[in-house]
Amino acid sequence: MKIISPVLSNLVFSRSIKVLLCLLWIGYSQGTTHVLRFGGIFEYVESGPMGAEELAFRFAVNTINRNRTLLPNTTLTYDTQKINLYDSFEASKKACDQLSLGVAAIFGPSHSSSANAVQSICNALGVPHIQTRWKHQVSDNKDSFYVSLYPDFSSLSRAILDLVQFFKWKTVTVVYDDSTGLIRLQELIKAPSRYNLRLKIRQLPADTKDAKPLLKEMKRGKEFHVIFDCSHEMAAGILKQALAMGMMTEYYHYIFTTLDLFALDVEPYRYSGVNMTGFRILNTENTQVSSIIEKWSMERLQAPPKPDSGLLDGFMTTDAALMYDAVHVVSVAVQQFPQMTVSSLQCNRHKPWRFGTRFMSLIKEAHWEGLTGRITFNKTNGLRTDFDLDVISLKEEGLEKIGTWDPSSGLNMTESQKGKPANITDSLSNRSLIVTTILEEPYVLFKKSDKPLYGNDRFEGYCIDLLRELSTILGFTYEIRLVEDGKYGAQDDVNGQWNGMVRELIDHKADLAVAPLAITYVREKVIDFSKPFMTLGISILYRKPNGTNPGVFSFLNPLSPDIWMYILLAYLGVSCVLFVIARFSPYEWYNPHPCNPDSDVVENNFTLLNSFWFGVGALMQQGSELMPKALSTRIVGGIWWFFTLIIISSYTANLAAFLTVERMESPIDSADDLAKQTKIEYGAVEDGATMTFFKKSKISTYDKMWAFMSSRRQSVLVKSNEEGIQRVLTSDYAFLMESTTIEFVTQRNCNLTQIGGLIDSKGYGVGTPMGSPYRDKITIAILQLQEEGKLHMMKEKWWRGNGCPEEESKEASALGVQNIGGIFIVLAAGLVLSVFVAVGEFLYKSKKNAQLEKRSFCSAMVEELRMSLKCQRRLKHKPQAPVIVKTEEVINMHTFNDRRLPGKETMA
């Protein structure tokens, strides 16, 4: 029997005990949960309730512990510490206290000074530091134990810039709360150098919440596009003050950089018409997110806001949602690192946590779909890189989503794709508008009534009917106010200030200007206009001239001076041509003594004086004893008779009108006539569109007219159309005004008339302040009225008067070349034909004489030409050789006494 050594026995027993204890520890470990502590440092206000971030921190830890899906074998605990605002020393002390307890990560604090102090400690000891608010990164630190769930400031700045570009703003005012706002909005601040954008930067008062002085200055400067970079609590106060100052109207558009715009109580502003736009990172369209937010609201973990704070009760703020997501993201990293344990760390020893680097890497690699959407981090600097923003805007139903923005795709506006039918009355329905106008017949005038009238019932006219139709279509109500200074609106050359209705629109004292307000270039630069509801132009109003009886020489009027001159020239020309052709044609020569066939003398009746007498006789329809014998001269005579027939008939027909009509002679017929004289004064309404036209015109005639008017400004420029019309009636004055008003006036006053045509072309439109959302609605309604024919019917209603008796033509039109020029062409053609016939007769007779006289054709032609060129009525014929004349030829000569004697054709 072998004996076992006591020493060996003790060794075996000891090892067995250790194995048993190890197995028991493993079994215990598998049957129990691992406990992990998170640290939270939060700022607080003395005597104030617990902050939303701390509540969300506790809510997230409790939710994870209740729902074992994420960390089934780990129980989270937390240690929370409170510090005063901006107390970095206290923040460092609290962080060291938590690290000595042993924490896996520290959440918070929020403000930069405290957060930087805590971050430096976490970096030194290798403990992750989780941030949920924006903090400026001084420099990239690859080894930084820091992540932030707040969207990157450069991305948010680009999102705001995209909104500004989408709204096509040209001027923007940036209002920031503290200096960090300029860093957050640096992309927008750099925009003027790259885009056509004017930027004005203002800062909210630091020591008070009273923003009224700043808002008053912005209102005076007409700054309608404003970006507010402030907290949602400050935004709520600003909106209340803006409402009290009348800055919550449709002309203002505010963009808020806070992601908590949805937490504001916007009920007082829903129907104000103000444009309010912002961003939201909470993914409220996700059912799981909505369920968590609903639990948050039901448990009412967050302390209710103060009664007049302007914030909604029970809403989960963005800071709270980001803290909730931050706890879950860190928990995802814990899930992937089950062997991690925490240890007590001392700030004065600078010994880092051995699991810190690995744990920090897991946090930066973590992905989570949280309340604020996808959560991923830049592994280098720990900033959140991938996120989606909802673009929200204030509507009558409240804040609604109108688009999205993300860093990769940019802005995507989806407001028009909501399936709602387009309705032009949406933005005007049930709104009450201030309408400025001016008394101007027939556009706006006081209604005549035996009973006292009040409000809008005091007025009637074309513009009042137009306003009533627009109100019916668009569904708005209105209050009519007469412009205070009684002017349409013009710009002062010295200080550049506007007056009249234009000024009231610029100052937003009125929403619409419904009046005969002309659309001009200079006005269009400061206010907006609808499409014109009436087109017109500038013309001249002048009194009708007195009638005059026909003058002593009015018998010359039926034909224009040009025609009289052409007739005289035609008479002289035809007479000369007849004389030449008669001399040239052999058949116009005859024997004055037919009984003496041997006579060598021949005669030609068409001497120069006789030719003129022949033309006068035909022209006076009396005839003469002279009768052409040759074909060529008869052609001249016939054409001249035809010419005189047409001329005399036309003259006779037109003479009656000139002798019976009283001519209405006006000293001016056009603007050129006005510009060329100074006897008749002329002017327009002071500070009206007509005056501005002449003032700005570069055309020499109109520039000359403006020089005349400006030199006599006090005497020729009038205050109103009524004053100008009265001056036309009582003095030698021409009034420049719109053609439609002239048409109305001349229908009712038969002593007035329009002189000339239109000097320019323009239109009347409904004026609105610059950028008004009403302009397009008004334009659509005006086009609808135009298509329905209502604009024409309204004009017929107000322009139709008793009418003046129809006037006969002021004067019969003198016949000009365009009326009877053809007869001159016929006359010229006849003269040309007669010349050719005369040449033919000359050649034929020369050839015949050459044969009879037995000589050459050329010598015979020269002899005939020599005789024709002698301006004598009777010539003696000198034959070159004797010729025996037979009896038959003598008899033949006596028979035709208009032919030359045989053998005598050639004259000496």
Curated annotation (Swiss-Prot):
Compartments (UniProt record): Cell membrane; Postsynaptic cell membrane
Mutagenesis / variant outcome for changing residue 567 to V: In RNA edited version
Catalytic activity: Ca(2+)(in) = Ca(2+)(out); Na(+)(in) = Na(+)(out)
Chain positions of cross-link Glycyl lysine isopeptide (Lys-Gly) (interchain with G-Cter in SUMO1): 886
Topology of this chain in the membrane: Multi-pass membrane protein
Record Pfam families: ANF_receptor, Lig_chan, Lig_chan-Glu_bd
Record has Repeat as a keyword: no
Family annotation (PANTHER family): IONOTROPIC GLUTAMATE RECEPTOR (PTHR18966)
Miscellaneous comment text of the record: The postsynaptic actions of Glu are mediated by a variety of receptors that are named according to their selective agonists. This receptor binds domoate > kainate > quisqualate > 6-cyano-7-nitroquinoxaline-2,3-dione > L-glutamate = 6,7-dinitroquinoxaline-2,3-dione > dihydrokainate.
Subunit field text: Homotetramer and heterotetramer with GRIK5. Tetramers may be formed by the dimerization of dimers. Assembles into a kainate-gated homomeric channel that does not bind AMPA. Can form functional heteromeric receptors with GRIK3. Forms a heteromeric complex with GRIK4 and GRIK5. Interacts with DLG4. Interacts (via C-terminus) with KLHL17 (via kelch repeats); the interaction targets GRIK2 for degradation via ubiquitin-proteasome pathway. Interacts with NETO2.
Record-given protein name: Glutamate receptor ionotropic, kainate 2
Gene that this sequence comes from: Grik2
